[in-house]
């Protein structure tokens, strides 16, 4: 249960700060500026997972999975304290930049999380465990959207603001919720047991990573397994379309629907996560740990 709680809180903390920044952008900016800034926020969250998947995977193999999760959880405490400081000082650009730092922390944590699932459940229960942890993550995201959006609007009741700085100062107490959640996550991560020891013999090829050769090699390796390659392509299309919609819809709702309440906007966007929860649980119902590859084209049809 500690592992599930760690995954839940980690997703909620990542989403919580993003929601606050997105809602701030929604309240202050309009039209193309709002769409562009929202797209940048989404990009800052996704890019670390692309550029850091090689070193993140190395760290997950080099050190024990619980150690990586403990270190990531502790770093989240420091990051959320800095974010809270930015809220109180009204440092919008700094808080905006901390979105990237928080995403880097999550990108380094992610391989250890999924590797730990395999250690706990083994090959036989891998499919069901992956589906359950994915559903847990999405539920955390939905919960984070509701909690932080409601808190955001509540802190702005009867408050006046004219720019990002004044708005952030009003909602600054929300930062302490991020800090508290990070502390709880770290305490729970400290309870995780080491099932595998560190491996001292692994060395990361930094030179190949910097010049891009390692990335090319990893991408080429995807071609060796068509199922993995097509799954990666499908996920790329899904998240590409999803992030485009998430960036455009708030501006559309504000301009066309004349809706300025972020609880309604974020609530509508949160509905998209319900389908992901159902799909994750459905994908985890394979017998004997087998992954239902037949669901991949079904998912593609549903997306189209």
Sequence positions of predicted segments:
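Small-residue-rich packing faces within the transmembrane alpha-helices of Major Facilitator Superfamily
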Residues: 77-84, 179-186, 304
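A helix-boundary/kink motif common to multi-pass secondary transporters
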Residues: 30, 34, 64-65, 91, ...
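Juxtamembrane intracellular "pre-TM" segments in multi-pass secondary transporters
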Residues: 1, 192-233
């Amino acid at each position: 249960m500690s592992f599930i709680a760690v995954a839940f809180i980690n997703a909620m903390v990542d989403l919580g700060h993003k929601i606050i920044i997105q809602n701030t952008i929604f309240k202050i900016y309009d039209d193309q500026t709002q769409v562009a800034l929202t797209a940048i926020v989404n990009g800052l969250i996704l890019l670390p997972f692309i550029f850091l998947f090689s070193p993140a995977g190395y760290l997950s193999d080099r050190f024990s999975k619980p150690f990586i999760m403990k270190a990531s959880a502790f770093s989240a405490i420091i990051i959320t304290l800095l974010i809270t400081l930015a809220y109180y000082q009204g440092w919008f650009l700094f808080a905006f930049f901390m979105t990237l730092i928080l995403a880097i922390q999550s990108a380094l944590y992610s391989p250890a999380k999924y590797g730990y699932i395999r250690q706990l459940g083994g090959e036989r229960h891998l499919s069901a465990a992956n589906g359950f942890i994915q559903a847990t993550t999405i539920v955390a995201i939905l919960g984070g959207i509701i909690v932080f959006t409601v808190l955001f609007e509540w802190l702005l009741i009867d408050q006046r603001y004219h720019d990002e700085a004044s708005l952030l100062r009003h909602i600054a107490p929300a930062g302490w919720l991020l800090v508290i959640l990070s502390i709880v996550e770290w305490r729970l991560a400290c309870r995780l047991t080491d099932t595998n020891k560190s491996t001292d013999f692994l060395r990361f090829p930094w030179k190949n990573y910097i010049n891009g050769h390692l990335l090319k090699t990893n991408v080429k390796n995807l071609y060796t397994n068509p199922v993995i390659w097509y799954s990666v392509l499908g996920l790329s299309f899904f998240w590409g379309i999803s992030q485009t919609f998430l960036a455009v819809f708030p501006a559309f709702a504000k301009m066309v629907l004349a809706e300025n309440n972020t609880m309604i906007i974020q609530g509508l966007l949160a509905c998209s996560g319900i389908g992901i929860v159902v799909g994750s649980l459905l994908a985890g119902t394979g017998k004997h740990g087998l992954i239902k590859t037949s669901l991949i084209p079904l998912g593609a049809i549903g997306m189209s």
